[in-house]
Amino acid sequence: MKKLKLHGFNNLTKSLSFCIYDICYAKTAEERDGYIAYIDELYNANRLTEILSETCSIIGANILNIARQDYEPQGASVTILVSEEPVDPKLIDKTEHPGPLPETVVAHLDKSHICVHTYPESHPEGGLCTFRADIEVSTCGVISPLKALNYLIHQLESDIVTIDYRVRGFTRDINGMKHFIDHEINSIQNFMSDDMKALYDMVDVNVYQENIFHTKMLLKEFDLKHYMFHTRPEDLTDSEREEITAALWKEMREIYYGRNMPAV
């Protein structure tokens, strides 16, 4: 896409929001409580603040204010307001490619925010526990928040990820013509690294004319030991392993497809 010469500030709002899910099997009530306590501590407000602050560093944003809170009995939220500094538009990379992990992108944000909320969850029947984190990066200016996608998914190791990206508003060029998007995009997947794409099965649902892009990700490899909390698969009987594997896989598919599925 040819670079635009704008009249005034770039008024496009670009929003990236995604849910990540971590699934676990905890055999007893004590193990379920232990998992919730573990995941709640792992992703407490301080840790989330560190992750989001690094995200700001990656995309070149200046932090104006941080609001964070841990909740009882569990959960946390962090919201960061960020601002823009003058930047040479010639230095802005608008091509479709994966964003960096810890590297710096020369770009800045204005009237923008980054926020995360966590939702640990379990049920007394079945032993299944889930952890969900909702993250939103909303920017107003020249850079797309998709540059932060790679880093965030790597930091929050996930079994399932659902991602939405949308562009709203318009900006004008020097001739007064409106532009409703200022960069090329045909898939969120183009902003992911090859190693990430190798780990997940992915499907897109995009509405190009509305500048709405959606990608769902499901971890390809299933290893039962990674889903057990304080229980080793080798300590279970064959039938127990099969039953737990089926329950976990059903849970993951239901979350991935967003609907309840019949028992197989």
Curated annotation (Swiss-Prot):
GO CC, alphabetical: cytosol
Listed pathway(s): Amine and polyamine biosynthesis; S-adenosylmethioninamine biosynthesis; S-adenosylmethioninamine from S-adenosyl-L-methionine: step 1/1
Single GO MF descriptor: adenosylmethionine decarboxylase activity
Catalytic activity: S-adenosyl-L-methionine + H(+) = S-adenosyl 3-(methylsulfanyl)propylamine + CO2
InterPro entries: AdoMetDC_fam_prok, S-AdoMet_deCO2ase_bac, S-AdoMet_deCO2ase_core
GO annotation, biological process: spermidine biosynthetic process
Residues annotated as site: Cleavage (non-hydrolytic): 111-112
UniProt key word Magnesium: no
Described purpose of this protein according to its UniProt entry: Catalyzes the decarboxylation of S-adenosylmethionine to S-adenosylmethioninamine (dcAdoMet), the propylamine donor required for the synthesis of the polyamines spermine and spermidine from the diamine putrescine.
Name the UniProt record assigns to this protein: S-adenosylmethionine decarboxylase proenzyme
Gene behind this protein: speD
